[in-house]
Amino acid sequence: MTEMRLTPLEIRGIAEAFVAARRGARPLAAFPVRLPNALDDSVAVQEEALRLTGERVAGWKVAMVPPPLRVPLAAERLAGPVDAATLIRCDADAIVEVAVYEGGFAAVEAEFVVVLGDEPRPRAEGFTAESIRDAVAWIHAGVEVASSPL
């Protein structure tokens, strides 16, 4: 089976639809254009949305790909940008209010937030657990309130 990759026009159309929905704080009735079936296309949509908004990336969220999607996407993990404007730093006893999309999707996830002090240095064999561990300055508990217009 040949996978149908998204065209540049489709990538832009998906990104524009999500950016407009987020800016208008309104849900989407369905996925715009068509659902990407390749991880590279999903990343391209994400990059186009960042370009359209001009948002600054504060960091990256690393997540596991659900087991049924690992073979089709040829990936076990993926990384997505954390928008600096949505990052809230607070004391442990603080009460924080965040908006979610009415009619969209929302979830709360516990996270480990890793702050790197130095850039990890790859070794001849690539990055190792030791080279990454040596670069870690802090590990914090975090909460992600994930919300999407879809």
Language model: regions and residue ranges:
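Catalytic-core "active-site belt" of small-molecule-metabolizing enzymes
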Residues: T2-L150
